[in-house]
Curated annotation (Swiss-Prot):
Protein name listed in UniProt: Uncharacterized mitochondrial protein AtMg01090
Coiled-coil annotated spans: 152-181
InterPro entries cross-referenced by the UniProt entry: Mt_uS3-like (IPR052694)
Location relative to the cell: Mitochondrion membrane
Native species: Arabidopsis thaliana
Additional record remark: A stretch of 270 kb of the mitochondrial genome is duplicated within the centromere of chromosome 2 resulting in the duplication of the gene. The expression of this duplicated gene (At2g07777) is demonstrated.
Keyword check for ATP-binding: no
Regions crossing the membrane: 4-24, 28-48, 62-82
Length: 262
């Protein structure tokens, strides 16, 4: 029984330490302590009023719960006092340093050594700033790169390479489909009796007609170009008529309205 009481006290101290360590000043604020104290007093009063109705085993468990709550409250109270004492010490140190500086300056005026006192104070401040900055620089330079940070950087680089490779593969496949449409267009025009002065006009006109299709999302681009190549030259392909317009715009007068697809 006594060992269990000691164990619960240690467990409460560990829980309170967790609050103070990871939750900061919010875990030991004055409001939280007051709320916890009210709950503790309420638990004690409730236990005293119901003690006569409880059995022996239930009474022992209630005692243990109260010991745990009291230990937790005492540790939180200790953390709150230490935090307040640290703030008070910092304020006292600041006031002391300010008083010391004012006292030193006034003594210099009385002794007609104002310049020497001012120079001494400025020199000391510069020395403190230089030492602080040099300490920060040396610590940042000598600090090794964390292993986790290097691993994350390598993982991001690998992911970037993988995405770049996938994009390059999709782009290459779409370019092949576009080249297949150029060959298909040349065959269809030849079947309809169209002879172009410059065979490269087919490629130029088709690239102009397919300009907006390259703006499709990368995930849907290959499938979109596959459908275009399959339906190219038919009424189901909405890029054939713009292709004819571009051919005519390039000066191919053999291409006329009868080559459009309804």
């Amino acid at each position: 029984m006594y060992l269990l009481i000691v164990f619960l006290s240690m467990l409460s101290s560990s829980v309170a330490g967790f609050f103070g360590r990871f939750l900061g000043s919010e875990s030991v604020s004055r409001f939280n302590l007051i709320i916890f104290l009210i709950l503790l007093v309420f638990s004690i009063c409730l236990f005293r009023s119901l003690k006569q109705y409880l059995g022996k085993r239930m009474t022992q468990w209630c005692y243990l719960a109260l010991v745990c709550q009291i230990s937790l409250f005492l540790v939180l109270l200790r953390s709150h006092i230490l935090a307040g004492f640290g703030t008070f010490s910092a304020d006292v140190f600041t006031v002391f340093m300010g008083t010391f500086s004012v006292t030193g300056s006034s003594g210099g005026i009385v002794n007609h050594q104002d310049g020497a006192s001012s120079e001494w104070f400025t020199y000391t401040s510069d020395m403190v700033e230089d030492s602080a900055s040099s300490g920060r620089t040396s610590s940042s330079v000598n600090q090794p790169i964390p292993e986790e940070q290097a691993w994350e950087r390598e993982a991001r680089a690998q992911e970037h390479d993988r995405i770049s490779a996938e994009v390059e593969t999709i782009t290459s496949a779409c370019e092949n489909l576009e080249a297949a449409m150029v060959r298909k267009a040349q065959i269809l025009l030849h079947q309809r009796g169209v002879t172009l002065g410059d065979p490269e006009d087919v490629k130029r006109a088709l690239q102009l007609a397919l300009h907006d299709d390259w703006e499709h999302a990368i995930d849907d681009r290959k499938r979109h170009f596959t459908v275009l190549r399959r339906n190219f030259g038919t009424a189901r392909c909405e890029r054939w008529n713009p292709f004819i317009d571009e051919l005519r715009g390039l000066g191919n007068h053999q291409v006329n309205a009868r080559h459009y697809v309804d």
